[in-house]
C-alpha cells in the first residue's frame, strides 16, 4: 500500500458544527463550475466558491440542518440547492441569479429578502441523508430521504398546471415511496449507450437508464448488525459499453471493512483496514473515466482504491468531523478532483487537483522505455536502448550513486 502526500490545498473559515451529510459539492449557481455547500447545526447554509476563505453565499434555514444536496429536484433543467433539517423542514434555494451579484454585497445583506428560501415545506422529521435521482426511470428526478429510524421515503415535486413560478409547487410523497426495515437502497446509474458524454457531478440530465439494487442485510450476512454501514453506487467503470452491462457499488463499515460489488451482488474485492471508516465517496483521480472508491476514517486516514484493488492512502493531519470528495473549482477556472475535510478547529480544508498518473505500482524502467525522449538521451550517451542491463546500470548510478553522465 503506497502513501501519498498532497500539498495543493486551501483553507476555508467555518465556525459552526455540522452533521456528516450536511456537506456536498456541485454546481449550485448553474455556472458550470462546482461549489462547496455546507449546512450547520444553527441553520446556516453556506456556499463556498473558488479559493475564497469566506462563504460566497449565506442563507438562513429553520432548525439544525442534517443534510444538503444539489440537483434538479424541480425538473426545470437546472440545479437547485436543497437543505433539510432534523425537525423536518425542507428548504429549496435557487442560486442561479446569485452568481451575478457581487460577493461583498452577499455578506452585507444577510437578512434581506434575497436570503430567504424559494420554498419551504414540512416533511417527517429526523432526516439523516437525502438523494436527488430518477428512481423510477420516468426521466424526472425524485427526492429520496433516509431517516434515523431506518425509514426511506421518496417525494416528487409537483406543480399546478397554471403555475407561474417554481415556488407554487410542493413535495408529494410517492404512493410506493416508503420502505422500512434494515435495508440498504442504492442507486446504480448505467451509462447511456447512445454515446452522449457524461456530465460533471450534480449537472442536470447527466444520468442515463438506471436500475435499483436492494440488499436485505440479514444477520447472517453482516459481521455486526450494530456497526454503521455506508454505501455508494453509480461507480463509473470507464467506457460506456462496460458501464452499461452492470453498475458497481461499494460499501464500508465502521469496523474497517471495504467492499466493491456489482449489481448481481458478486464481490469483486474486499479490504480490511485498521481504521474506523465513517465516509465513503467516489472520485476519478486518474482521469481515465473510472471512478475510484474513496473512504475516510475519523483520524484523517483516507484510502483510495481502484477496481483492481490497488490501494493508496493519504493521511490528513487532523481528526475529521465530516468528509466529501468530488469535483470543485478552486483555481485555474475549471473543475478538478478534490478531497474536502471538515476539522474540529473551525476550518475546512480542500485538497484540489487530486490526481494520479496511475493507481497501480509499476517499474520505473518500463515507464521510461515508453518515452521517446528517454531513448534519445540513451542514444546521445552511447547506450543501447535494447541492452536492458546497461540501461538498468545507468539509471541506478544516476539515482543512487549520483554519478555525472
Annotate each language-model stretch with its function:
Residues 1-405:
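Beta-propeller-forming repeat regions
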Amino acid at each position: 500500500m503506497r502513501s501519498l502526500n498532497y500539498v495543493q490545498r486551501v483553507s476555508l473559515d467555518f465556525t459552526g458544527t455540522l452533521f456528516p451529510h450536511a456537506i456536498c459539492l456541485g454546481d449550485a449557481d448553474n455556472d458550470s463550475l462546482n461549489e462547496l455547500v455546507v449546512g450547520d447545526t444553527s441553520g446556516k447554509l453556506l456556499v463556498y466558491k473558488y479559493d475564497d476563505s469566506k462563504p460566497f453565499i449565506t442563507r438562513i434555514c429553520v432548525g439544525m440542518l442534517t443534510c444538503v444536496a444539489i440537483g434538479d429536484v424541480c425538473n426545470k433543467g437546472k440545479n437547485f440547492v436543497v437543505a433539510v433539517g432534523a425537525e423536518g423542514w425542507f428548504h429549496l434555494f435557487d442560486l442561479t441569479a446569485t452568481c451575478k451579484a457581487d460577493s461583498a454585497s452577499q455578506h452585507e445583506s444577510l437578512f434581506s429578502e434575497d436570503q430567504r428560501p424559494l420554498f419551504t415545506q414540512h416533511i417527517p422529521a429526523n432526516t439523516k441523508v437525502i438523494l436527488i435521482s430518477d428512481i423510477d426511470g420516468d426521466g424526472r428526478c425524485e427526492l429520496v430521504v433516509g431517516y434515523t429510524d431506518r425509514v426511506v421515503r421518496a417525494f416528487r415535486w409537483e406543480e399546478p398546471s397554471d403555475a407561474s413560478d417554481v415556488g407554487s409547487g410542493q413535495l408529494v410523497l410517492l404512493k410506493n415511496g416508503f420502505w422500512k426495515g434494515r435495508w440498504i437502497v442504492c442507486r446504480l446509474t448505467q451509462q447511456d449507450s447512445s454515446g452522449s458524454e457524461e456530465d460533471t457531478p450534480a449537472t442536470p440530465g447527466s444520468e442515463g437508464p438506471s436500475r435499483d439494487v436492494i440488499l436485505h442485510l440479514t444477520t447472517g450476512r453482516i459481521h455486526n448488525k450494530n456497526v454503521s454501514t455506508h454505501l455508494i453506487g453509480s461507480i463509473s467503470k470507464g467506457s460506456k459499453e462496460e458501464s452499461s452491462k452492470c453498475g458497481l457499488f461499494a460499501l464500508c463499515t465502521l469496523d474497517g471493512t471495504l467492499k466493491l460489488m456489482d449489481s448481481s451482488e458478486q464481490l469483486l474485492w474486499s479490504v480490511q483496514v485498521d481504521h474506523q471508516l465513517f465516509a465513503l465517496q467516489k472520485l476519478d483521480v486518474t482521469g481515465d473515466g473510472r471512478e475510484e472508491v474513496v473512504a475516510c476514517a475519523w483520524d484523517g486516514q483516507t484510502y483510495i482504491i481502484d477496481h483492481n484493488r490497488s490501494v493508496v492512502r493519504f493521511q490528513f493531519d487532523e481528526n475529521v468531523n465530516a468528509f466529501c470528495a468530488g469535483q470543485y473549482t478552486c483555481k485555474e477556472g475549471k473543475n478538478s478532483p478534490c478531497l474536502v475535510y471538515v476539522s474540529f478547529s473551525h476550518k475546512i480544508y480542500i485538497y484540489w487537483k487530486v490526481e494520479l498518473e496511475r493507481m497501480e505500482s509499476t517499474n520505473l524502467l518500463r515507464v521510461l522505455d515508453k518515452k521517446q525522449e528517454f531513448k534519445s538521451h540513451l542514444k546521445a550517451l552511447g547506450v543501447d536502448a535494447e541492452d536492458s542491463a546497461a540501461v538498468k546500470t545507468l539509471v541506478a548510478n544516476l539515482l543512487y550513486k549520483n554519478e555525472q553522465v
